[in-house]
Structures are given as C-alpha cells and as structure tokens.
Amino acid sequence: MSTIIDVYAREVLDSRGNPTVEVEVYTESGAFGRAIVPSGASTGEHEAVELRDGDKSRYLGKGVMNAVNNVNEAIAPEIVGFDVTDQAGIDRAMIELDGTPNKGKLGANAILGVSMAVAHAAADFVGLPLYRYLGGFNAKQLPTPMMNIINGGSHADNNVDFQEFMILPVGAPTFKESIRMGAEVFHALKAVLHDKGLNTAVGDEGGFAPNLGSNREALEVIIEAIEKAGYKAGENVFLGMDVASSEFYNKETGKYDLAGEGRTGLTSAEMVDFYEELCKDFPIISIEDGLDENDWDGHKLLTERIGDKVQLVGDDLFVTNTQKLAEGIEKGISNSILIKVNQIGTLTETFEAIEMAKRAGYTAVVSHRSGETEDATIADIAVATNAGQIKTGSMSRTDRIAKYNQLLRIEDELGEIAVYDGIKSFYNIKR
C-alpha cells in the first residue's frame, strides 16, 4: 500500500495554445504520477463538462484556473490518504464529490487529470509500465492506427466539410510496419498535393488542410498517394472518415448543409445515400458520426444500409457514456464506439464503456482530441484494454507523434508476445 500525500494541479498549454489542466500525484513511498488533460474542438452536447473560466481578459475566456483550483482545494483534500492503487475508489469519490450527472461542478478536466495521474503514480509504485498495470498480463495487442492525413471541418481553415480523412494500414504485419506505411503515404500525399499546386500546411491534428473541390476529391488524392507510396488501396491500406456531421447539421431545418460542395438541405436519407455511394467507389472501412448526434433515426438507417460491411463509429453519438452506448446497442445503432477519456471524465468509466462495447460485439477505438499535449496516456490505455484501434492524428506534430512513439516502445518491450491484428481488428464487419 502507498498512500497519497499530495495532489497538485497547474495550468499548462495544449497543442492549440489553449490552457488545460496538468495534475501531479505524490505518495508516501515516493511514487509519482503526472498527467495532462486533452481538449476537443468539435464536442458532443452530451459530453461531460470541460470547465473554462470565461474571463475574456485572460486567454480569451479559455483559462482553466477554476478547474485547477477545484483540484487543489476540493479534490486533493478528499483523496489524500487513499491507497494510490484504489483507482475505482478514488474515481468514485470524485464523482460523488462533484454530485452532478455531467461533472459540471468540479469539471471533467479537473477530475480526469487526477484520475490519470493517480494511475501513473500507482504504476510507478508497483514498478510496472502503465499499460501492464491497467491491463494485466493479457495486455499485448497493439492497435491499428487510424491516421488523419487530411483535416477539414472544425480542425482546419479550409472548405472541406468532413472533419477527417484517414488511412488505416491494416495490411502491415506489425505496428511498427503500420507506422512506416502510414508515414510513407503521408509524405507521398504531400508530394501529390504539391504537384497539384495545393496547400500543404497542416491542421490541428497534423493532417494536410488544402482547399478541395469536394469531399470526394479528398478521397481521390489519398488514393493517389497510397499508390504513389507503392501500396494498394483496399488491400494494404483502407480509408476512414470522421464526418463530424453535427458540425454542418442545420438544427432549424433538420437538414445537412455541405457548404464546401455547395449542397444544402440534404435529408438524413440523402446523406446515407451519399455514404453508400462513396463506399462503393472507395475502399472505406470506417465512418464516424455520419449523422447528427441526435439524429438516431438517421443512424439507424445508416446501420441498416452499410453496417454489415463498414465500421460505424459513434463519437458525439455515444460520448464514451455507458448509458448512451447501452441505448445504441438496444436499438441496433452503429457498431463501434469512439473512446475519449475526457468525454466521460475518469479512467474507471472509460474502461466500463470499452468493456460494454466489447460484450455487445461493438469495436472500440481509443482516441485523442484535437487539442493534445505530450501526454501519451491513451497509447497505454489502447494496449491495456486490447482495444484494437487507435485514432491519434497524422504523421506530423509532436503532440500526435508522442502517442505513436509510446506505442512503438510498448511493442518493442512486449517483443514476441506483441499482437497486431490489422484487418482482424474489424471483427464485426465483412471484409
């Protein structure tokens, strides 16, 4: 047993230059843990509350000193004296201290920072890497990376409606080789865009952010890059999209407006038709948030039409929340959940969501946020839970590469027992 003797939070910066919460946990044994909380740009309305100060004279209102003070003045006195390995007990104590259904009193960013830092300190105490401490002896599966190489929507200042266009190097024999394949396609895409006279600046998640004629054109240039890198689309490398359709859903009309394509007033059925057409023309294996988070009828139709052959990921739809996920499972909506630790606010609840998804035959994709830091906790979570997939950005920006590098270290440490399933990680669709 190692008792927590101090918890301290401070305000630091994320990859967008916005403040976020960093937490440190100290124990009587000398074990120590530190974690930094990520932040999203396109957020679901049902997510746990990220507490911002709202003081426009400081960081344009985005300061997090209220959350920092909640850690130092409210949470710290509550959990000092706890055994650092009592993760569930500590998380439960913070949830009860907050007392709201969405962590709106203390802030999910305050609670999560402590939850993750506690896990790091506990792993340090028992002398295990974080993935092994959290996942036990069976933690050995490296995730298939979903690499966001073209950014649009809320993640870029361009005219592309869909938020992310991803490559999935499912044909690689190991995680290390999947990273190599992804990097080669990324560099090939830069050359393709350059040759077309298009911008090669990158967006929030490290992908290129050119102005393109349509969402279809984004897929076309990625196919060209895959082939230029010497791979076969639909064999070595598949495509994925995070549509983030809530960002262009018109609540007043109940329709979808693809402004970048000049197509407005699309119904849910017309959006489903569009996705089905794209999936016939391109090797798309995963679509995230294809309809608005509250358009459950649209999600149901999409699942019925292509859910047997395409992974349909619920992000804003489920917000890493077991109640939302249970409802989706009961109604047969989507077949996968995106896992974002700050959507729910504790590691315990995060692990519960992953477990529920797997029991129901849904896949689970561990994910970063657009506002990230050097913290690589999600890499360890992906291996600890044998999630099978991770979405953590492109092949540029250190805040993204930090997660890939941590996974490379883990694979190296696991040695011969490391598993990389590639295409088999999409176990609930026909491929």
UniProtKB/Swiss-Prot annotation:
Required cofactor(s): Mg(2+)
Key words of the record: Cytoplasm, Glycolysis, Lyase, Magnesium, Metal-binding, Secreted
Domain of life per record: Bacteria
Pfam hit, one: Enolase_C
Subcellular location: Cytoplasm; Secreted; Cell surface
Name of the molecule in the record: Enolase
PROSITE patterns registered for this protein in UniProt: ENOLASE
Reactions catalysed: (2R)-2-phosphoglycerate = phosphoenolpyruvate + H2O
Pathway terms, separated by semicolons: Carbohydrate degradation; glycolysis; pyruvate from D-glyceraldehyde 3-phosphate: step 4/5
